[in-house]
């Protein structure tokens, strides 16, 4: 297996940098994320730093592990270790005769892409903040008011999780959320039938549901709550689009329970092929530390609506 380190390099406005493979390399003319092979005795992060300096002339300052995926090409099996790069010194330029292009990850206009990069672009369409409804505490009217403000401030991914609502009330509430968040992704917690009825974008499975499933539910986006490596492995084996792991820190909703902490979170998600959100006791300003420990982003309950 060939080990490769690749960088998802983000501009300040959220665009990503892609490079076009030059003549003389396998797959000439295909677009890819910058990076290259990991040499013997080299860590994936050190390999990426070296490759980015040699390939596009930048020295990363902010670089964090993200996801790892294995891809089978006709000529080789490749393990791609992806890192998020959000700060660097230097100006990116093609030092190996390759063309470079900044692209909106939600609307990539260059083609063709290396086949291994298609699922990576899909994962990049998941926003960094996953907001979980809290109408049981706020009340429906206030929750919708706060949701409207959050959507205006950039929230793009909402999970409807209201265990105390009866089915009819939950359906009415979910339809209001769908109408309010027309430009956001909306997932329903646990209730697959309701999610299909209201044409939600996704389903969020409980860990118990996850462990009893043998086939991924048919939704655009399918995620699950996980608490350990065994449950995360199950989410991966079903081909889920993302997972939410916690609780990372102590939280009022689980009094007396210690959080798993960032080191254990990081060790559990290391090398995972799907994006993982961190959950539990977090605030909006914890996004950076979460991503430093390998999280795709953060899932917020109370803090999402402040």
Predicted regions span which residues?
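Conserved N-terminal beta-strand and adjoining loop/helix that marks the start
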Residues: 1-16, 68
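Active-site-adjacent beta-strand/loop module that shapes the phosphate/pyrophosphate-binding cleft
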Residues: 11, 69-91
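Conserved Nudix-box catalytic region and its N-terminal flanking loop in Nudix hydrolases
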Residues: 15-55, 66-67, 185
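NUDIX/MutT-family hydrolases
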Residues: 82-86, 92-125
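Active-site mouth loops of central-metabolism enzymes
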Residues: 127-142, 221-226
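Conserved, mostly hydrophobic/aromatic
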Residues: 131, 158, 195, 235, ...
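Alpha-helix-loop-beta-strand connector modules within alpha/beta enzyme cores
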Residues: 171-190, 207-210, 215-228, 257-283
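Glycine-rich phosphate-binding active-site loops on the catalytic face of alpha/beta enzymes
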Residues: 206-215, 244-256, 281-306
